[in-house]
Amino acid sequence: MPAPKTIYFSQIAAGAWNDWVRVINISNQRAKVLAIARNHVAQTVWSAEHNLNPFEAWHPPVQGQADRRGDASLEIRSDQPIVGERHCHSGTQVLDFPGASLETRTVANRLFFPELYSGAYDWLRVFNVSEMEALISIVARDVNGRIVRQLQGRAIS
């Protein structure tokens, strides 16, 4: 499977959570990397560029920059293959998320989540990575497959 040249992070959290993102050029060529943060209506609120040598890492300054006006989504593009992760923490809670991409099959038209637990206040954030408007349908089922809740909405690119 080829490594991606574009990766996505659905949320860079403003407020109490502290975020950092690391991007690594995994090719043998110098890479030109562009990070773009967008608000909830897909308007660009911040961007930064960086050149990376082979296997060099970059930490785009998302904390206090990309999230200055609130939560943002992040797209990272490169002319060479890249991998990346988002690390965030609040007090002693630490979360890590790999960058989503078409190549790693973490961006798709259909996603399945094995469990939602109401006591944990689970929530989903959908990020449209297409140039077209998307119709989003969410169907929650119980353990017997019966529909418990259905939601539908549109997401612009």
Task: Place the predicted regions along the sequence by residue.
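Gly/Pro-rich, tryptophan- and cysteine-flecked surface segments typical
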Residues: 1-157
